[in-house]
């Protein structure tokens, strides 16, 4: 719970036939100060007067006071200052403008697995509310993480109580230049380390409130990370995407690991603000997927993805040009005279909310696939067909020979 320590509060209200004069002040100590003023020439009545002017100001208001209205995982600290001033008009209409500034702001996002903290060098919102629209602009600058700017025009008529006009026109423009420095590492501790990258976004929304249409571009560059569980470093990650109305088109994607790389492209179609259909392709040559003491592997995938997220069809092949399996445990090894054949090997795991997928992918071993274990030093060859109806119930059929 958030406590509020009011050091001093004063108020004055004088409403007679000559008009209304009201004034209120509150000193919250270290939590800031609030001042409010309202004047009107109208005589006394129930409710707000039809005419008048008002001004509300806040100075160094503790941003933590607003945490109760945020989600449990989100918290804000810093000092908020701002003003709101305007006129009262007949029929509960308004003509007002103002701004809000955040200084020394720190935004924290915390859940059971991660805690992310971002410091804001500058955060300013300016707005004007008159006639049939609420418009304004946002300027956000994050320490070490880039900038975001937005201009908006929303169909919210300037009257009380406020309500959105669903048939009214919407205009929104967003520009962002963000730098990722360790945020992914904080969100996925242990899984991702030394994450980095740059994101450039330019987007716009038009249409009506009930039927908005978006378009823009997204670029990711200079990105990379270390994946300790796989023992690899992914670098030179780039991506370009365009989004328009109900479609997101990834025109290019590329990532480097070890001696090779992967690249891809695809299209995501949206319905009811969710992904409805996927079409994508991923290919590569000698991409380092694992580099651990017990296992090293390069992969050359050629895969296609098509369908709805809950009925995704995966087809293609993965060539393993380099594979080295090292054995560290001493155990009895039985070697057949000619080869070892694996047929119908089940990869089923414990079922827990299975993710449906229609998979048929052939995995082919290249010329440099070896096993070096206690009592075994041999080359592997062969291929298997991996099929699945869900990601937790895969099956491989074929043969791998020593």
Task: Cite the ranges covered by each PLM segment.
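Interface amphipathic segments
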Residues: 1-402
